[in-house]
Amino acid sequence: MAEVKLISAESVTEGHPDKICDQISDAILDDMLRQDPHSHVAVETSATKGQFWVFGEVTSKGYSDIQSIVRDTVRRIGYTSSVIGLDADSCGVLVSLSEQSPEINQGVSRIDSDRENAVSREERYEAQGAGDQGVMFGYASDETDVLMPLPIHLAHRLAYRLAEVRKNGEVKFLRPDGKTQVTIEYDEENRPLRVDTVLISTQHDPEVSQEALREDLREHVIEPVLDEVLGDAVKHDDYRVLVNPTGSFIMGGPAADAGLTGRKIIVDTYGGAAHHGGGAFSGKDPSKVDRSAAYAARWVAKNIVAAGLAHKVEVQVAYAIGVAEPVSINVETYGTEADGVTREQIQEAVRKVFDLRPAAIVDELDLLRPIYSKTAAYGHFGREDDDFTWEHTNKVDELKRAIATLVD
């Protein structure tokens, strides 16, 4: 008898306390990049009942109205009344931002931004070291069209749809806080076979019954998403649905649980399908390799899979603070390489095609733009948005050519 292999992943809505904090931190980052693309930003946000605290280190030529950014973000998410636990107009906002340490800055910015046009690109790439040490991972798999693991892809789509039907009124009685989780059964060849369980926990008004909520979510959220994403490729005609398993979920957001930037790093990435170096993304400008190198590693992995060189890939890259060149690059293909191609050849092709120095990553992926607010909910990867440049498969042909020279 074949062993049943079940793999799960979760996502959260934009109204989850930790995700509120991520979105605030990235909204502040975007505002600073909009005024000064070379801003160095490391902003954290914490949340508790009726209160936000924004703190961290910033070096920027611009000025950001932090109070307004916090309130605008909270309002956009949907927290507009103390009745649901948080009011954007009356919540408290404390701000404690200081300048970036000059010792950190000296290893990152050896060329002043005003002089960048006076030096060659190669000089600039060599001059900008990594903003910190660390290990970053990127992953791609051909089990979905967007080359993401199916459990996290479905969980994100369900979370997004849950927020969508709340905002457009398609499902009444919903409030902003919510979580989703999907369990997929895989076959002996590690291909998705069927949906086993869909779990949704969502904040709601007190007058709705759990039975009515369950039926509405199944009709307007679960079934449309499964049909659209899966079609006939993965069975989804007999799965378990769990909605608010503990009962009512009336009080949510920071009124129920404290929130903090960077506490949903597995939700933000691959749902547990790949390793994680531990560094969060939100609130960090692209000089921080926690963010930019993780984006680049996804870009590398996705291009490898899109080129047909492997079915599943994890890319690891590591840096030393103040040093431009990665201290290591490793490509793991889990034995899924294309016929006639070795893992070592793929790794060598990656070194030939991709420049993973921090300044080169920033240039290649155009990361100095104010694009980060929309990354802060529903996943940083697997999104079909032109601003998510790390999702572009623009290196496929170069990889194929590089492999051809190595195989021959």
Curated annotation (Swiss-Prot):
Question: Which GO biological process annotations does it have?
Answer: one-carbon metabolic process; S-adenosylmethionine biosynthetic process
Pfam families given for it?
Answer: S-AdoMet_synt_C, S-AdoMet_synt_M, S-AdoMet_synt_N
What GO molecular functions are on record for this protein? ATP binding; magnesium ion binding; methionine adenosyltransferase activity
Bound how, and how many: what does the cofactor note say? Binds 2 divalent ions per subunit. Binds 1 potassium ion per subunit.
Name a GO CC annotation attached to this entry: cytoplasm
Chain spans, region Flexible loop: 100-110
User: What positions does the entry give for L-methionine binding?
Assistant: 57, 100, 257, 288
EC no. given is 2.5.1.6
Q: In which residues is ATP bound?
A: 16, 177-179, 257, 263-264, 280, 284
Cofactor(s) recorded in Swiss-Prot or TrEMBL: Mg(2+); K(+)
Does the record bear DNA repair in its keywords?
no
Protein family per UniProt: Belongs to the AdoMet synthase family.
Cross-referenced HAMAP family? S_AdoMet_synth1 (MF_00086)
Q: What is this protein called?
A: S-adenosylmethionine synthase
Q: What organism does the record attribute this protein to?
A: Bifidobacterium animalis subsp. lactis (strain AD011)
Q: Which gene encodes it?
A: metK
